[in-house]
Amino acid sequence: MMKSSELEKKKVLVLGTAKSGIAAATYLVKAGAVVTVNDGGTPSENDVQTLESLKVETLFGSHPLSLLDGTDLIVKNPGIPYQIPLLQKALELGIPVWTEVELAYRSTKADWVAITGSNGKTTTTTLVHELLKRGSKRVHLAGNIGFPAVEVAQQAEAGDVIVIELSSFQLMGIESFCPVSAAFLNLSPAHLDYHGDVTSYAAAKARIFSNMDEAGRLVVNADDEEVMRLSETAAAERLTFSRRQDAYAHIENDMIFVGQTEILPVRELALGGGHNLENVLAALTLIEPFGISLTAIQDVLRTFGGVAHRTEYIGEFAGRKVYNDSKATNNVATEAALSGFQSPIIWICGGLERGADLTPLKSAMTHVKHVIGLGETGQRFADLATEQQIASTVTREMEEAVATAFDVSKPGDIILLSPASASWDQYKTYEERGEHFIRSVQKVGGMMK
């Protein structure tokens, strides 16, 4: 743990505002650091007011290299790419560049449970949090689905547990971060515009276990060859999970096992879908050392229905069942969603163009009846449909896409938003996209008989 006094009078540049930047700046000011906050864009009015109250130096609209003069440390927003000249120069000068997670880790004596992977992070993290809440320790949820890590760390004490979902962006900026229990769920090409290539992306993910020793527990997917290969170098105890083969956590005659312990029949899980079964196996292996009672575990598994925007059932409108899977920002997540239905699917997809190969989606399109392309990649998805001899429509915005979905569907069909693309061409977050979808469904579907 880093003492606050170690930051006193240190010159720290906080790069980027939003939640994590504001939280980092607030902590650093309290620790006595000399803080400058820089954002290449225009921060929100609330962020500006907060920074004014902190009495820190600010510079918005650009990233001049002069900001590095005398700087001892940079704490960056995870989304800011390392390719910008300011960060390239900082690395050249040997200035440490952290994400807020590293700062948070150094500021508390609490234990950390961390989850990464291309898909399933949010569901697994939320489930782990729910399970650990049934134990004897105080548990905190941090990161993308909770409060900023450094904010949570200030509330956590020795003996507490912080559960955190970690992206490759966040893991790029760790130095000493070391969880007591970590999961590497799966790996598929994503964020290549940020990392440059699959190798760099995979290496960033693997950093989750880079500081772990034999006292730690690393949970990995036995069915993912690349995850298994990458984790061979881990010093931590490596335990596997699989829904297809023998592993430490596995399925046998419809029964979930962790080690030799029978947990629950699969049919009793509230959480549906094969991919979610993998998330359950990973979560159970992660929390095993914490001594949660079997009765408590079973109670959570029978009631935990998942998270918003992840194959979320919205309801039935005019005989059509509608699902919001806005969090599916890559092929693997969307493949899992498409494969989970047997009824005809009206598939709304598309978003930010990242140059991803859409070919792998073909095998999951068996039940797709109509493809509705949306956003920058909308036409590419329509072209994919044509290749599969499936009808398609390209639309400009969400309400038009939803109206089209109801027009081309009939009672008994599934309307599924599963974009296989990031949201940033039209929305700030996948949550904003999902909420717009839900409002559009309620508006359009509510007018139909």
UniProtKB/Swiss-Prot annotation:
Q: Where does ATP bind?
A: G117, S118, N119, G120, K121, T122, T123
Which Enzyme Commission number(s) are listed? 6.3.2.9
Tell me the domain of life. Answer: Bacteria
Which reaction is catalysed here? Answer: UDP-N-acetyl-alpha-D-muramoyl-L-alanine + D-glutamate + ATP = UDP-N-acetyl-alpha-D-muramoyl-L-alanyl-D-glutamate + ADP + phosphate + H(+)
A matching Pfam family: MurD-like_N
Q: Which family does it belong to?
A: Belongs to the MurCDEF family.
Q: What is this protein called?
A: UDP-N-acetylmuramoylalanine--D-glutamate ligase
Which species is this UniProt entry from? Exiguobacterium sibiricum (strain DSM 17290 / CCUG 55495 / CIP 109462 / JCM 13490 / 255-15)
